[in-house]
Structures are given as structure tokens and as C-alpha cells.
Amino acid sequence: ELNGKPVFAKGANYIPNDMFLPRVSNAKYEKVILDAVNANMNMLRVWGGGIYENDIFYNLCDKYGIMVWQDFMFACSVYPAEGALLENMRQEAIENVRRLRNHPSIALWCGNNENNEAWFGWGWKKKYEKQNPKYAELIWNQLVEQYHVMLPKVVKENDPEAFYWPTSPFSEFGQLS
């Protein structure tokens, strides 16, 4: 729903425009956003394996009515979510939520790209359980702490009206019972 009206999201996964970021001009950003508009898209997902985009990207999405599914920059891996690294992750999330929260285009914050899928669907869980069950449990608990506790708390505290989704793709796989 958007402003009380049902919305069907039509969009694409957005990755950085160039591996050399300074080569991306404002005109290039505008072309990409207008290409989405002209393709009848209304949403772009900022991929968690990329970057938090420049303000011009979000300003153009605001201007042209493109909703943004904003991934946090965690992708296709497990991260030792404890101690100083977990605090660094938290601070990065706070900084980016605060920076982007006033953009009306931000429709959703998403914890990561494919980390749960990798754990359950790509066989990481079985692999780690076979190697060392205690280590597998530690990894899973850290994943839960990061994507189901810490990041949703950051979003709730810093952008309380925003939606949060733990991972993309996401299905329960029975793991949260």
C-alpha cells in the first residue's frame, strides 16, 4: 500500500552504473531512472552487493516517483556479527538510514542479499553443521542477531515508519520456529 492505495511493484535490480564510480555523471543517473520510468517500472532495488548510492540517485527517484527497495550492503556471505564488527555494522546502518530516511522514494529497508538463501538453499547450513555443529550454531545465531535483531532495531529507531525485510529472497524454511 502507498498512501492507502494498493500498489503492484514493477521493477528491477539496480547495480552500480560503473565499476569506476566517478565516471557516473548526473546525466547517466537520470537516464537510468528515466529508462525505468519509460519501461513502466515503479521500483528499483538497490542491490546489497553494490553501494549506498549517491544522493542524486535518490533525488531522481523522488522526482520521478520510483520507489526504492534499499538493501543494506551485505551480500552472499556470512559475517562475524559480534563485538567491534557488529558495532561497525550497526553504525554503518544508522548513518545510512539517517542519510536516506527523508527520501519519499525509500519504500523498504532490506537486511541483505541472499544470505538466508545461501544458508538454507545453497547448502551452507549442512556444510557447516557437518564440519562443526557448534560453529554452525554460532554462525546462525550471528545471522539472526544481525538481520532479525540489530538491523530492524536500527530501522525502527531511526526511520520508525519504514518497512523492514530481513533478506531477499526470503522464505521461512522452518528456521524461525
Language-model features: locations:
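Active-site region of glycoside hydrolase catalytic domains
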Residues: 97-177
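Active-site-adjacent substrate/metal-binding segments within catalytic domains
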Residues: 1-77, 86-108
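Short, glycine/charged-enriched secondary-structure capping and boundary segments
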Residues: 58-60, 83-84, 123-126
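Hydrophobic alpha-helical scaffolding
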Residues: 79-86, 137-141
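Short secondary-structure boundary/hinge segments and terminal tails
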Residues: 54, 78-80, 173-175
